[in-house]
């Protein structure tokens, strides 16, 4: 009995595929791929980002406050590290400077060329302070540099920091108080003092107060006394005339108000015969508490501002009828309050 064996499997490994490719391309010239220069330039541009420390100090104190409220001071970090470093992207145009606070970059802020940093004068010689003005939101950072041994900050540290800040931002190491005083002195010297010509102002009404008094040097003492007495008398008479003119104005004003008839709203609501022709109405005349003398003056001098639209002929006396009064042509301006005693 014959035993059937299993068929052999064809090897399909990587070497076999490579062998088959050589057999297919046997006798053909090799094909070279074209050279692409862009691929090489892309590879050359790929560089790792490098961080370079420009300045570092391990013992600083940082405080912050908003620009609108300088009294609201907050301590951000105390006894922490201060570092200024540069990030290089492989191109001179792609370099950025950053400010880092804390050992693990707890606070990081970019340093732009327009960033303003100023030195603050300190009372203590061992301290060195700078103020950094930040935006979005507007606030200030006060960085105090301290020495490790509680002594004076080394001069080398201050020089290195000032040299770095002067290159990457707007740094001012001058005392602001002295600088402002110098600026004000220079401004005062530069501005010339204006020459003001003082002229006497001519008043158009000055002739009313002027008195025709001759010079006292040419007048004897007796005549000067008489002139003084006459001037006092004239001033008293002038004051008296002013008082009299004020009384005349007040009296005329009272008479003008007296000609206005106070309107009684109750009687006008009961009768529909009356029509008000004047839009002016004084509220203070409607008060019922009016003195008897004032009411009598009103009846004598006031003029009616409201008349009946239809005149009641019964209220008119026979004497007026005999005079031949044409009531159809009578207007409200021609009728006085005395013509209608019933109102």
Swiss-Prot record:
Cited InterPro entries: Inp1
Q: Which domain of life is it from?
A: Eukaryota
Q: What is its main location?
A: membrane
Biological role: Required for peroxisome inheritance.
Keyword Calcium present in the record's keywords: the answer is no
Keywords from UniProt, A to Z, are: Membrane, Peroxisome
GO cellular component terms, semicolon-separated: extrinsic component of intraperoxisomal membrane
Q: Name one Pfam family in it.
A: Inp1
Task: Tell me what topology the record assigns in the membrane.
Answer: Peripheral membrane protein
Which GO terms of type biological process are on file?
A: peroxisome inheritance
Q: What does the sequence similarity comment in the record state about its family?
A: Belongs to the INP1 family.
Name of the protein in its database record = Inheritance of peroxisomes protein 1
- Disordered: region residues: 1-48
Q: Where is the composition biased (Polar residues)?
A: 13-41
Electron transport as a keyword of this entry, yes or no, is no
Gene, per the UniProt record: INP1
Location in or out of the cell: Peroxisome membrane
